[in-house]
Curated annotation (Swiss-Prot):
Protein name per UniProt: Retinal dehydrogenase 2
Impact noted for substituting residue 383 to T: In DIH4; uncertain significance
Residue positions, PTM Phosphotyrosine: 168
InterPro entries linked: Ald_DH/histidinol_DH, Ald_DH_C, Ald_DH_CS_CYS, Ald_DH_CS_GLU, Ald_DH_N, Aldehyde_DH_dom
Catalytic activity of the protein: retinal + NAD(+) + H2O = retinoate + NADH + 2 H(+); all-trans-retinal + NAD(+) + H2O = all-trans-retinoate + NADH + 2 H(+); all-trans-13,14-dihydroretinal + NAD(+) + H2O = all-trans-13,14-dihydroretinoate + NADH + 2 H(+)
Phosphoserine carried by residues: 351
Gene it is expressed from: ALDH1A2
Length: 518
């Protein structure tokens, strides 16, 4: 094959002096943030749980309690489903609303998120531990773009006429499915909230959504904005609670027509089983990953090192897309490892509210312990620990940026999703070899390849068993493009036009006519 060079975006290198000089231009966290919304949101009203139970919410940077939130269980889910079914009933305000008006409401919601962007970013940092500037510029930007993207789609979803045989007039309608149950994770609480509700509302559905018990605060705040935007009562209902109670009630509820879940593969299996046992509700699952990132010797090495670093360590490594299996061609392996270790050692770990922080804490003690246990397994199985590997001796759940070399495919750290700041670097010799090894996984969410040869890039991308493949980039997610997994990384697609298919049913209508004319 003839080599054809691919143009890559230039690497951005931060000037520390320039950064410090420009800090006054950056957005600031909201000081003394008041947590106003801690109750269940049903029918546009704030309510206590039927049981009267509450649960604590923590700041992972300190381990200290922030507040208590009402704990929803099956009784509360029943109330929410009843409200959502009423809002979806024929002749309701929501069902009779013009599609363009649904779009206007989503646009209004985006406006309100923009207005309260600093408050919401502060909440994501306080409750989730992510750096404030990441929350402000990445998470909140994604939320706003998602709402605006689907606002534009609302009055552009339509069927078609079909020239069937005989004296008939046949057309299709794209109708909302009904009441959608949605369960979202703790790693991107607000972004996943938007990913779930925006396409559902765009298509005219109603929603019962459960945020993760670790991070309910931003979702509850959105309840106030939803009401302010003018959504009718019962259209969106927000219920904080635990998976085995509130989550299980959503998955098995016969009054829910569709369920969408983002989280672990293990829980995804349980949800699909519950959906089948109850009313065979429609299911969309966005699950775990163990994504390969393939670096060829002809790649721009500095650029590839930085992209691979961000692809693993972004969001404290708490990404389903994390490129944790980094396959590096043998001739550049040692140099790639050396530069990756240097970069990991420069990574700034600290308070989420410090503008120089790149990495905050893990979400909770359970995840912290799981990550450290997997790191120890890597050492025990013979991988070389190049740097990191320990928790930091401070309050909160901080872990050092960790890099392993000499990793082999049979090690636990090469097979299991770590969901933490741990980079595993493997070596390969040939393209055929690396394709086979990269695909040798139960997961198939994303993959990436770095090379200046377009033929290599397209050969690898077409061979990868993954829902998304990035060439000379990583984590390039957009509201306009579909996202979802192969194999045990899930089913269905979110985002883009394809995301609308998950929230609509196609109905065929045929009319007998006296005479058909072409």
């Amino acid at each position: 094959m003839t080599s054809s060079k691919i143009e890559m975006p230039g690497e951005v290198k931060a000037d520390p002096a320039a950064l410090m000089a420009s800090l006054h231009l950056l957005p600031s966290p909201t000081p003394n943030l008041e947590i106003k919304y801690t109750k269940i949101f049903i029918n546009n009203e704030w309510q206590n749980s039927e049981s009267g139970r509450v649960f604590p919410v923590y700041n992972p940077a300190t381990g200290e309690q922030v507040c208590e939130v009402q704990e929803a269980d099956k009784a509360d889910i029943d109330k929410a489903v009843q409200a959502a079914r009423l809002a979806f009933s024929l002749g309701s305000v929501w069902r009779r609303m013009d599609a363009s008006e649904r779009g206007r409401l989503l646009d209004k919601l985006a406006d309100l998120v923009e207005r309260d962007r600093a408050v919401l970013a502060t909440m994501e940092s306080l409750n989730g531990g992510k750096p404030f500037l990441q929350a402000f510029y990445v998470d909140l930007q994604g939320v706003i773009k998602t709402f605006r993207y689907y606002a534009g789609w609302a009055d552009k979803i339509h069927g078609m006429t079909i020239p069937v045989d005989g004296d008939y007039f046949t057309f299709t309608r794209h109708e909302p499915i009904g009441v959608c149950g949605q369960i979202i994770p703790w790693n991107f609480p607000l972004l996943m909230f938007a990913w779930k509700i925006a396409p559902a509302l765009c298509c005219g559905n109603t929603v019962v959504i459960k945020p993760a018990e670790q991070t309910p605060l931003s979702a509850l705040y959105m309840g106030a904005l939803i009401k302010e935007a003018g959504f009718p009562p019962g259209v969106i209902n927000i219920l904080p609670g635990y998976g085995p109670t509130a989550g299980a009630a959503i998955a098995s509820h016969i009054g829910i027509d569709k369920i969408a879940f983002t989280g672990s593969t293990e829980v995804g299996k349980l949800i699909q089983e519950a959906a089948g046992r109850s009313n065979l509700k429609r299911v969309t699952l966005e699950l775990g990953g163990k994504s390969p990132n393939i670096i060829f010797a002809d790649a721009d090495l500095d650029y590839a090192v930085e992209q691979a670093h961000q692809g693993v360590f972004f969001n404290q490594g708490q990404c389903c897309t994390a490129g944790s299996r980094i396959f590096v061609e043998e001739s550049i392996y040692e140099e790639f490892v050396r530069r990756s270790v240097e970069r990991a050692k420069r990574r700034v770990v600290g308070s989420p509210f410090d503008p120089t922080t790149e990495q905050g804490p893990q979400i909770d003690k359970k995840q912290y312990n799981k990550i450290l246990e997997l790191i120890q397994s890597g050492v025990a199985e013979g991988a070389k620990l190049e740097c990191g590997g320990k928790g930091l001796g401070r309050k909160g759940f901080f872990i050092e940026p960790t890099v392993f070399s000499n990793v082999t495919d049979d090690m636990r750290i090469a097979k299991e999703e770590i969901f933490g700041p741990v980079q595993e670097i493997l070596r390969f010799k040939t393209m055929d070899e690396v394709i086979e090894r990269a695909n040798n996984s139960d997961f198939g969410l994303v993959a990436a390849v770095f090379t200046n040869d377009i033929n290599k890039a397209l050969t690898v991308s077409s061979a990868m068993q993954a829902g998304t493949v990035w060439i000379n980039c990583y984590n390039a997610l957009n509201a306009q493009s579909p996202f979802g997994g192969f194999k045990m990384s899930g089913n269905g697609r979110e985002m883009g036009e394809f995301g609308l298919r998950e929230y609509s049913e196609v109905k065929t209508v045929t009319v007998k006519i006296p005479q058909k004319n072409s």
